[in-house]
Amino acid sequence: MGDYIVKATAYEDNVLAFAALSKDTVNRAKEIHSLTPTACAALGRSLTAVAMMRTMMKGEKDKVTLVIKGDGPIGSIVVVSNFPGIVKGYVGNPFVDLPLSEKGKLDVGRAVGKKGYVTVIKDIGLKEPYIGTVEIQTGEIGDDIAYYFYTSEQIPSAVGLGVLVGKEGDVLTAGGFILQLLPDVKEEVILKLEKAIGQITSVTDLLRQGKTPEDILTSIFEEEEVKFLEKIPLKYECDCSQERFESAILALGKEEIQKLIKEEQGIETVCHFCGKKYFITRERLEELLKEAEN
């Protein structure tokens, strides 16, 4: 079974729900970045969350970026989704290795840190993107994204994210859910949802049991009718290219390109998201300079 996201409603369309299975997606990220288990859990949770957040957006060309910058040893976490069901990301320190937490879990909160900021950038094709920034709450990522939704978008939300890493470092399972109250919801629905969320042990436990995204939502809402609206395949994929790299060089302007021509025989860069290397020769830099001058 491949990775995918489901979108649904519950409580007579008063709650919007998303759930994802992201095992292969997270495993691909682990392979690309040589992630330790702790770094894998941190990036995996973030990838899963952003994949669901992109599903909330309506435009085909809409983009969402999540940046988590805490004071922990993992450094920054950056995840981008430019298309529905396609994500990419990286962490500042993929080799961070910490002891298990007091609960015997991978200590993502300590890796991320308790001080810092969560920033969400949504580009829906307007002149300026929407940028929302909130303080990190726990560093566990799920709590922090729920706090972002409530504080920055005024949407009460519950976010559950999980990544289970085996003893050999392989990703055994990964996934999560996001539940959001729609406007003007009745108090009784809020109480029902709070009770349902309170009964969830952990997303990882549900995934370990082999629950699908549909199963996860059905188990959360129990006897309530869940209307499944959409199913979207999910994968890790980078859309970098030589053209994009050259466009970034052009954006530097004439003076900077002239400096590069004087100081370098050529430029090599590595994509943060997939590790692919790109090279621009001195001759190509001179061509780009002519374009910049025109």
Curated annotation (Swiss-Prot):
It holds the Pfam family HSP33. Disulfide bonds join 238-240, 271-274. GO terms for cellular component: cytoplasm. Gene3D superfamilies: Hsp33 domain, HSP33 redox switch-like. Coiled coil: none annotated. It is found in: Cytoplasm. Under oxidizing conditions two disulfide bonds are formed involving the reactive cysteines. Under reducing conditions zinc is bound to the reactive cysteines and the protein is inactive. InterPro entries: Heat_shock_Hsp33, Heat_shock_Hsp33_C, Heat_shock_Hsp33_N. Keywords: Chaperone, Cytoplasm, Disulfide bond, Redox-active center, Zinc. GO terms for molecular function: protein folding chaperone; unfolded protein binding. One of its GO terms (biological process) is protein refolding. Redox regulated molecular chaperone. Protects both thermally unfolding and oxidatively damaged proteins from irreversible aggregation. Plays an important role in the bacterial defense system toward oxidative stress. Belongs to the HSP33 family. This is 33 kDa chaperonin. It comes from Caldanaerobacter subterraneus subsp. tengcongensis (strain DSM 15242 / JCM 11007 / NBRC 100824 / MB4) (Thermoanaerobacter tengcongensis).
